[in-house]
């Protein structure tokens, strides 16, 4: 899915100048390098998609006023696909200062430039967009799903973690075999970050694959009922569904919508776990929140039934399910 995300965000229109500057600065930091050629600074950025390279070349010209050349490197050696190098020779030293690759005295800046680090939320989004275009990857949803960016050093990694924090997204910096990386593993956080990057089509595709995988995993668990604990959990879930059905009958239109929604989820997915119900909720809920809402729904219905002198929620239980508990 990495290629799909990069293709989509390479086509994303960005109009605010500060965001375009932040994106260029980030791409040059994560995909680029400074070289001294005949005493002059030459800037190079190596990308794996032509669309991202053309976007960078255009923005360098339109925002910073510098021409660049685009060099295509054919596959060979360890490279499976073509690589695209954007090179700035004339004005390289000036561009290095403009984008925060070096400070006013010409000393290299290891992380992201101050104007990006302390910028607005849109600058943090742009920094992540640039970093992902430069060296990002997204794995398929599953146990080891992750969104990851390879970083040029620990300072850049920490700056990217800080940018994620400003977007309320948990990311971790780690060093693996001498390479600094920033990783986002939580499924919800990955979806939120992709949305922030502007990869809306990719978010839908990723979430759909994630949901299909979870449904398959649930089906496999339900098909393998050798484990007694799993059987008890499933019976308890079915029992809760039966009690919820009776609760909704008792309360009718008096039930609060958020409790009714939790109850309907329990009825529609009788053998799902509370965690799975939470993932199906809109917006998603924790398993404790789902359990709490179902408990309140049943308690409200049983109190109402007692006041009216009619059978409560447990009247819907068969003998087999009579001892089961919610979820």
From Swiss-Prot:
Region (Disordered): 308-327
GO molecular function per UniProt: DNA binding
Keyword Transcription regulation: yes
Control of this protein's activity: DNA binding depends on WhiB.
GO BP: any one term: regulation of sporulation
InterPro entries: Homing_endonucl, Sporu_reg_WhiA_N_dom, Sporulation_regulator_WhiA, Sporulation_regulator_WhiA_C, WhiA_LAGLIDADG_dom
UniProt cross-references to Pfam families, sorted A to Z: HTH_WhiA, LAGLIDADG_WhiA, WhiA_N
Description of the deletion phenotype: Mutants form unusually long aerial hyphae that fail to initiate septation or chromosome segregation.
Coiled-coil stretches noted in the UniProt entry, renumbered to this chain: none
Disulfide cysteine pairs (residue numbers): none
Induction note: Autoregulated. Expressed throughout vegetative growth and sporulation. Could be post-translationally regulated.
Stored NCBIfam families: DNA_bind_WhiA (TIGR00647)
Function of the protein: Involved in cell division and chromosome segregation. Plays a central role in the initiation of sporulation through the activation of multiple components of the cell division machinery. Acts as a transcriptional regulator that is involved in the direct control of genes required for key steps in sporulation, including the cessation of aerial growth, the initiation of cell division, and chromosome segregation. Functions almost equally as an activator and as a repressor. Required for DNA binding by WhiB. May function cooperatively with WhiB.
Similarity remark: Belongs to the WhiA family.
Name of this chain's protein: Probable cell division protein WhiA
Natural source organism: Streptomyces venezuelae (strain ATCC 10712 / CBS 650.69 / DSM 40230 / JCM 4526 / NBRC 13096 / PD 04745)
């Amino acid at each position: 899915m990495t290629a799909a995300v990069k293709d989509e965000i390479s086509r994303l229109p960005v109009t605010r100048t500060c965001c375009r500057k932040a994106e260029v600065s980030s791409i040059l930091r994560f995909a680029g390098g400074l070289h001294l050629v005949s005493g002059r600074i030459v800037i190079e950025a190596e990308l794996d998609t032509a669309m991202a390279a053309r976007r960078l070349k255009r923005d360098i010209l339109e925002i910073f006023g510098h021409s660049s050349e685009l060099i295509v490197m054919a596959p060979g050696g360890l490279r499976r696909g073509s690589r695209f190098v954007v090179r700035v020779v004339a004005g390289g030293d000036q561009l290095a200062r403009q984008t925060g690759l070096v400070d006013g005295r010409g000393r290299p800046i290891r992380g992201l430039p101050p104007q990006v680090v302390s910028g607005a939320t849109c600058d943090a989004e742009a920094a992540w967009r640039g970093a992902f275009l430069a060296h990002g990857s997204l794995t398929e949803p599953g146990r080891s799903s992750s969104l990851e960016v390879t970083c040029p050093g620990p300072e850049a990694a920490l700056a990217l973690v800080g940018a994620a924090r400003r977007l309320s997204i948990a990311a971790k910096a780690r060093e693996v075999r001498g390479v600094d990386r920033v990783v986002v593993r939580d499924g919800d956080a990955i979806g939120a970050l992709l949305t922030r990057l502007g990869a809306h089509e990719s978010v839908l595709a990723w979430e759909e694959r994630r949901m299909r995988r979870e449904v398959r995993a649930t089906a496999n668990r339900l098909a393998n009922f050798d484990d007694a604990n799993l059987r008890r959990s499933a019976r308890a879930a079915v029992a809760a569904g039966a009690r919820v059905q009776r609760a909704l009958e008792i309360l009718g239109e008096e039930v609060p919508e958020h409790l009714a929604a939790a109850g309907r989820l329990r009825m529609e997915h009788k053998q799902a776990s509370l965690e799975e119900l939470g993932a199906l909720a809109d917006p998603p809920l924790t398993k404790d929140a789902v359990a709490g809402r179902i408990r309140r729904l049943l308690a409200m219905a049983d109190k109402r039934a007692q006041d009216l002198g009619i059978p409560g929620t447990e009247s819907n239980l068969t003998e087999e399910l009579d001892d089961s508990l919610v979820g």
